[in-house]
Amino acid sequence: MGLDQDKIKKRLSQIEIDINQMNQMIDENLQLVEPAEDEAVEDNVKDTGVVDAVKVAETALFSGNDGADSNPGDSAQVEEHKTAQVHIPTENEANKSTDDPSQLSVTQPFIAKEQITHTAIAIGDSYNSFVANSAGNEKAKDSCTENKEDGTVNIDQNRGEADVEIIENNDDEWEDEKSDVEEGRVDKGTEENSEIESFKSPMPQNNTLGGENKLDAELVLDKFSSANKDLDIQPQTIVVGGDNEYNHESSRLADQTPHDDNSENCPNRSGGSTPLDSQTKIFIPKKNSKEDGTNINHFNSDGDGQKKMANFETRRPTNPFRVISVSSNSNSRNGSRKSSLNKYDSPVSSPITSASELGSIAKLEKRHDYLSMKCIKLQKEIDYLNKMNAQGSLSMEDGKRLHRAVVKLQEYLDKKTKEKYEVGVLLSRHLRKQIDRGENGQFWIGTK
């Protein structure tokens, strides 16, 4: 509360300062009044002895405006007078307006309201030399000071009145704007209606026909139906003027029923089948197609023939190693066994096979010996390199290189070991064949 009271006091003092500044500016402007008017005012004061401060202020203001209009040289002074009425904020007021921005709009109309009362004070001060001895002047001063005190004390009431005046003015402006907008809309609506009426056709459009129009429509349709030579098309009577849904359904049914009747009464005269027939109709077997002589069965039989031709063309090729006949005679089996045994017993074929097999066996034995020696050598190299790496006499880079070399040698050793195993398998197969034929029937088996 203390802060609010301090702010109010500062605001009141600032308002008083602003009012004094405005009074000084009004005094300066009143000094520009013509001397004739001053003399008239002085005569009235001398005769009556009472100064009407409000009337003097009004006459001074009106005379100032007339003088500005008549004298072009005084236009600059009048403009100063007009600009002087605008509230110019000082440094203190600017600082206070930052604290209370909501009170700025309230104080401005209050200052404008107080200008009228204080013009009387300013005018009375300017004419003190003329009315110094009059008692009415003292009364005017007392009344002005009382008004000033009332204005400073009852600031909240004046603020409330100013707020009410602002709200009323805003309401009046809003109502004026609203009425202007409504008038503009009404004008636009009338213009649009006039344009639409200008674009309308001169003849009236009747959605429903009655009486004579219905009879005319039926006569036209009868003439049209009688002019048609096709017997399937029949005259249709259209009733105009009913509900929209009923007319829509009747037109849809009228479009569908003639199509269905034509499809039933007029079969396919060309004898061919349409794409819809091929989808809906069922194919009849070939036996029934012989009995029935219809075009549809003929078409189905042709379709079956085309399918058979397609199947014949896309048939798989036969297997050349297919078994044609299987005989269950025991003599044929015995003969086949004897022939297979006699191949090796024949004197012509045995030397050739033995020579080729002996050459292959020698090559396989030589290759097997070479691979076994190679594997032994690689294993020795790998062991030597691993021993060198285990001693730790090499640097880090050399150790990494040695490790990569050992890995590659191990891969090469595995490859050669696999090849050695395969060669040994082939060699053992050839030796088993020789044992089966009886060429090498004796084996010396010993233990080391």
UniProtKB/Swiss-Prot annotation:
Q: Name one GO cellular component term.
A: cellular bud neck septin ring
> Does the record bear Transferase in its keywords?
no
User: Which residue ranges does the record annotate as region Disordered?
Assistant: 63-103, 171-211, 242-352
Q: Where is the composition biased (Polar residues)?
A: 264-281
Residues annotated with Phosphotyrosine modification: Y344
Compositional bias of type Acidic residues: which residue ranges?
171-180
| Phosphothreonine: modified positions | T257, T274
Its induction note reads: Expression peaks during S phase of the cell cycle.
Any GO MF annotation of the entry? protein-macromolecule adaptor activity
Alphabetic keyword roster: Cell cycle, Cytoplasm, Phosphoprotein
Localization in the cell: Cytoplasm; Bud neck
Quote the subunit structure annotation: Component of the GIN4 complex composed of at least BNI5, CDC3, CDC10, CDC11, CDC12, GIN4, NAP1 and SHS1. Interacts directly with CDC11, CDC12 and SHS1.
Q: What does this protein do?
A: Required for normal septin function and cytokinesis. Its recruitment to the bud neck by CDCd11 and SHS1 ensures efficient localization at the bud neck of MYO1, the type II myosin of the actomyosin contractile ring.
> What is the name of the protein in this document?
Bud neck protein 5
Organism, scientific name: Saccharomyces cerevisiae (strain ATCC 204508 / S288c)
